[in-house]
């Protein structure tokens, strides 16, 4: 299903072998294809809200008495790790890291001119 959708979006150098993005010899996505996928994803209002959230707190549960804070580590939208990389037009993004790929980043910005 993911491979069919990627092809529908115009991706030509992508093959998903799992749904979690973790390393697999047959799991590949080019930067161009990731841009195509991301351009489609940002059109979804829930996705846009999630990737643009700076901080979220999971309420207490029967397993955890205190709230659990989740901080966005994307330095262009969140000052969690300092303010030097904040970008006023950034509306969201997704950071990532695996031992095979190293650091990864997709970022969305809008500037009305």
What are these regions (language model features)?
Residues 1-113:
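Penicillin-recognizing serine hydrolase domain
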